[in-house]
Amino acid sequence: MPDGPLIVQSDRSVLLEVAHPHAADARHDLAVFAELERAPEHIHTYRITRLGLWNARAAGHTAEEILGTLEKYSKYAVPASVTIDIAETVNRYGRLTIERDAEGTLILRGTDAAVLSEVSRSKKVSTLLEGKREDGSYEVAAWARGQLKQELLKLGWPAEDNAGYKPGAHHDIDLATDGWALRHYQEKAVSNFLEGGSGVVVLPCGAGKTLVGAGAMAATKTDTLILVTNTVSARQWRDELLKRTSLTPDEIGEYSGATKEIKPVTIATYQILTAKRGGEFAHLALLDALDWGLVIYDEVHLLPAPVFKLTAELQARRRLGLTATLVREDGRESDVFSLIGPKRFDAPWKEIEQEGFISPAECKEIRIDLDPEERLIYAAASDAERYRLAATSPVKIAIAKKLIAAHPGERVLVIGQYLDQL
């Protein structure tokens, strides 16, 4: 039995011994299917979830590969219950498929008649189906493609969407590769996205997610709607597209609080899309303003919840999500999987760092002690109040000042959650 850096526990948590000589390799392979939960100094905790396994399967990884990783790096034998659970979970992906027949009707098919029968008896699923065919498949309501995927995922049977997409209005877009080219991982991300039809590309900050979007636009050559977090991001996207593609200023529009332009490539903010007037979304017309062939969601982990409902109605368009993490604060990762698409590509930051594409990062954790007066207040506080008290401790300000003073003349970015503290 190899003395590896991992301890796999029966609750599907995985402990990584950071000081182990093979820890970096194990972390790289583990990131394919497990999410980092906690990262204190010596032991990192990962969690293997059903969604993580299905994302890995959608990206082309098999149950055998996943189990092979755990067995290769585990300090002890992987619990039999975990082995069985992983194999069964991974093999659930793709047992159901959504397809389109020659007449354009959406069809729900299954490789296992028992599974198809099981899900069709679900009350919520049955309302989305329009009848059973002679071959045992089911016709799906034209408007229900997104909702059906959501409901099937909740039942534990994620459907593979092979129903295809509207090509959208043709628009010539080429990469202006004079003196530069997409990096190998960016090319792979674009290739995987096109092969899968829709889905999410996960790249670390600074790795060039915008260029992946530009590459997808050049490959699809269609009217494109780009949704971003704010107007600053919108203008960054515009500048990058003008620099890296054949697009001209007249072909790119900004649709935000200040400007309402609709062009073959339109960049809109999430805020404007979710703005309401009289209780109704005021800018829904943007979704049908042009025959979009591609919709890009920048920083998809920040996608506002109301946009999910709108995205459910965009299932006939190619959708590309860009993000540095699939983890959302509201826990709606399953909606990203169902409505944007599964993970199509994931490049670990360490790998890109080693190749020199992003600056090396040195991470340090500094723990502080509350002073006696703060400890008394903390002890009497509720859980919610405790979080804020710990987060805004004045001791942190003193330490931050020391750290800044230790880096004179350097550019320093301080990130925090509470504005009054910043």
Regions found by a protein language model. Give the residues of each.
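Extended alpha-helical interface modules used as scaffolds for assembling large macromolecular complexes
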Residues: 1-168
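Conserved pre-motif I regulatory segment
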Residues: 167-202
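Walker A/P-loop
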Residues: 196-217
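Hydrophobic anchor at the beta1->P-loop junction of P-loop NTPases
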Residues: 201-203, 226, 414
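Conserved helix-turn-beta segment of the N-terminal RecA-like "Helicase ATP-binding" lobe
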Residues: 231-258
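Conserved helix/coil segment N-terminal to the catalytic DExD/H
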Residues: 256-294, 302-310
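Post-DEXD/H (motif II) to motif III coupling segment of the RecA-like Helicase ATP-binding lobe
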Residues: 293-294, 299-364
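Conserved interdomain hinge at the start of the Helicase C-terminal
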Residues: 377-421
